[in-house]
Amino acid sequence: MRMLLKSFFSILALMACITASSAADEGTIIKGQVILDKVPKVEEVVVTADKAVCCKDGPLASTQMLVDPKSKGVKNVIVWLRPNDKIRGNEFPKDKIPEALRKPKAVTHIIDQPKCQFEPRVLAARAGDKLIVKNSASIAHNVNFASPIDGQSFNKLLQVNAELAVENAFTANRFPIAISCNIHPWMAARIRVFDHPFYATTDANGKFEIKGVPEGTWNIVYWHEGGFHMGIDGIYGFATEVKGKTLELKPVTLDFAKKEDKK
């Protein structure tokens, strides 16, 4: 009897996964790429502590702006959808999210700091997800965690080979969560949390995919640690008609300047 029940619940879990996957496949897949017009010179970090460890393999390169020399693709740009309006705080409408994608299984994300940098430096997550911060380095770090909406903030020492599970699950936040290390002040990480599934982070070639998007006109927002694409004008995103099985967008050249600044 116990085996039958176990098999029954396993089948239910599998069916839930298949349903969620089918819902994602039913909508439109948005594919795009974020690039820079020129590949910037890789900057070196000014290391002020633990130089023997942080610089043991040579100068420590900044990870703030990562651009692939060949494709000019920009890594760590978070791309998401929002309503086609200019109302600050409006998020993707819940009634437009397919039922199977409204309450996904929570994911536990991991941020490590093996080489005097947070890895990954930029993270996109969904409300309900959790976070573990690890320290696989041979030196101590500290985790200065500041969440601007839910007040979940702390500053804790993280010894060698230790890990810290953030107590509360993420809540949706229109401002990025900031993580830093007071011992090594150049270290930084950013987390954006959404209450819908229509977001992505660009890969090493600046490419991204957002699956299962309902048809309609949605605004696409591009955000990098350095700011929004097109500055303050880009906060509300750029109107895009979504339809069909796949929508291939033209590459977006990342630019932090406002339209007025270009006149």
What label would you give each PLM region?
Residues 1-7:
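Positively charged n-region of N-terminal signal peptides that target proteins for export
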Residues 23-263:
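Extracytoplasmic copper-binding redox domains, predominantly the cupredoxin/blue-copper superfamily
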